[in-house]
């Protein structure tokens, strides 16, 4: 019995000493923000993703009573829209996704071997998206969180910035877009 306990203890200790090296590795076989932006193709793919329809919200026609009859009711016509409303939360998160992706392109969008005119075009598209997204956020929500490169720790405690400050930054981004785009 003592011999079995020794083998059992040795086996448990052996198994407990094995572990994975680092479980926080990005999948090396797939693209991620850590291993992307090496060449022109990857940067263009990242920019093309900024033009997905989710990032350009269109208001529904049934939100207005000018075209449809006034007998129907919905959250907008009743004035009961809250942050829990599906459209509201989806737009908020989609616009911030586009901001994060545009910022990532600005931070990493100048890989070696790309002409200056192409880099400027990439910067222009990313700045346009930043400006557009912040304009949309202020149109829908007024004050919103302004991310000018905050760290993750800062993001956890970030508060909304005044609408006029966000719009000033959005217009600054749109001016840069006009400067960089051909």
Language-model region placement:
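Bacterial Sec-dependent N-terminal signal peptides
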Residues: 1-29
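Short, compositionally biased low-complexity segments
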Residues: 18-27, 73-75, 142-145
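Membrane-proximal, proline-rich intrinsically disordered regions
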Residues: 20-63
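Proline-centered turn/helix-capping motifs that create local helix->coil transitions or kinks
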Residues: 21, 58-61, 137-146
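Short linear capping/connector segments at secondary-structure termini
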Residues: 29-32, 80-83, 148-155
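Conserved, well-structured interaction surfaces
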Residues: 44, 75-141, 155-168, 172-182
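Short alpha-helical hairpin
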Residues: 61-81
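Short, small-residue-rich loop/turn micro-motifs
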Residues: 144, 148-150, 174
């Amino acid at each position: 019995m003592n011999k079995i306990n020794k083998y059992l203890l040795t086996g448990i200790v052996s198994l407990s000493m094995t572990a994975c090296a680092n479980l926080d590795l990005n999948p090396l076989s797939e693209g991620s923000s850590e291993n992307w932006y090496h060449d022109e193709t990857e940067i263009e793919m990242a920019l093309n993703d900024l033009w997905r329809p989710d990032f350009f919200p269109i208001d529904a026609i049934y939100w207005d009573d000018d075209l449809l009859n006034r007998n129907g009711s919905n959250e907008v016509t009743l004035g009961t829209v809250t942050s829990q409303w599906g459209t509201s939360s989806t737009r908020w998160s989609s616009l911030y996704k586009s901001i994060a992706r545009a910022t990532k392109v600005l931070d990493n969008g100048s890989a070696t071997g790309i002409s200056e005119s192409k880099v400027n075009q990439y910067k222009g598209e990313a700045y346009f998206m930043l400006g557009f997204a912040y304009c949309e956020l202020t149109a829908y929500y007024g004050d919103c969180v302004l991310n000018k490169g905050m760290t993750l720790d800062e993001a956890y405690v970030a508060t909304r910035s005044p609408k006029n400050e966000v719009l000033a930054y959005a217009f600054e981004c749109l001016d840069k877009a006009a400067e960089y785009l051909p």
